[in-house]
Amino acid sequence: MAGAKEIKTKIASVKNTQKITSAMEMVAASKMRRAQERMAASRPYAESMRKVIGHVAQGSLEYKHPYLEVREAKRVGYIVVATDRGLCGGLNVNLFKKVVADVKSWKEQGAEFEFCPIGARSVQFFKSFGGQVSAQASGLGDAPKLNDLIGTVQVMLEAYNEGKLDRLYVVFNKFVNTMTQTPVIEQLLPLPKSEDDEVAHRWDYIYEPDPKALLDTLLVRYVESQVYQGVVENIASEQAARMVAMKAATDNAGTLIDDLQLVYNKARQAAITQELSEIVSGASAV
């Protein structure tokens, strides 16, 4: 059994770690609330944009935008949103597993692929994973702006415009609640048709000044908004996962301290018993 002094040192070390994880839990909780507010503010716009674009994809237009045309998938692009920092449980690992599984299914169909990682962990993973990394972004902070992403997204859009990509997806962790964050893969291009029941009405739109000018701008804004929403959702997911992970670490540290305290008490008791035995033996000898 380790000595009482050594055990006491371990207890002090674990207590220091517990203070750190507890502080990180509180910081993550605060950041999560702010991230949720930003996510809630941008989500209605992103969902409305997705719905409108879905109806446009179903409509009969005199101008057929290239983003509406489905072509054979020879090369697939992924915009993968992960975190800049760790200590957030299995958030990034689960996301990467989902991407790898999807890449494998496309690979079996003979398709090639390229990536646009967003977040330091995503950049690190895909540089070692293999496949072309066409663009990347990291260090966006806890409150990114749309302008921070436009250049990165534009690289992938240009590749699609030039026929170098036939499919484009965005991958991120969707925030469900504090305890649940789900990795999702959403198709950006070609535009997915709306699954909304309202599509049965076959909405008809009047375009001013003309369909081409409007759609050329609108569809690019759509892709940018969906990627931005993915980044905002992922930040909220990151803070929630980190808060839960740090709470678990704090609780585990408390359990470990209790166990070490018990061992310390036993060691201390054994030392006292030994000292008493030595005193009694010495007295008997006299």
From Swiss-Prot:
Spans through the membrane: none
GO terms for cellular component: plasma membrane; proton-transporting ATP synthase complex
Localization in the cell: Cell inner membrane
Membrane topology summary: Peripheral membrane protein
Residue runs in coiled coils: none
InterPro entries given in the database record: ATP_synth_F1_ATPase_gsu, ATP_synth_F1_gsu, ATP_synth_F1_gsu_CS
UniProt keywords, alphabetically: ATP synthesis, Cell inner membrane, Cell membrane, CF(1), Hydrogen ion transport, Ion transport, Membrane, Transport
Signal peptide: none
MF annotations from Gene Ontology: ATP binding; proton-transporting ATP synthase activity, rotational mechanism
Top-level taxon of the source organism: Bacteria
Pfam families named among the record's database cross-references: ATP-synt
Biological process (GO), any one: proton motive force-driven plasma membrane ATP synthesis
Task of the protein: Produces ATP from ADP in the presence of a proton gradient across the membrane. The gamma chain is believed to be important in regulating ATPase activity and the flow of protons through the CF(0) complex.
Subunit structure: F-type ATPases have 2 components, CF(1) - the catalytic core - and CF(0) - the membrane proton channel. CF(1) has five subunits: alpha(3), beta(3), gamma(1), delta(1), epsilon(1). CF(0) has three main subunits: a, b and c.
Family according to the record: Belongs to the ATPase gamma chain family.
Protein name: ATP synthase gamma chain
Source organism (scientific name): Shewanella oneidensis (strain ATCC 700550 / JCM 31522 / CIP 106686 / LMG 19005 / NCIMB 14063 / MR-1)
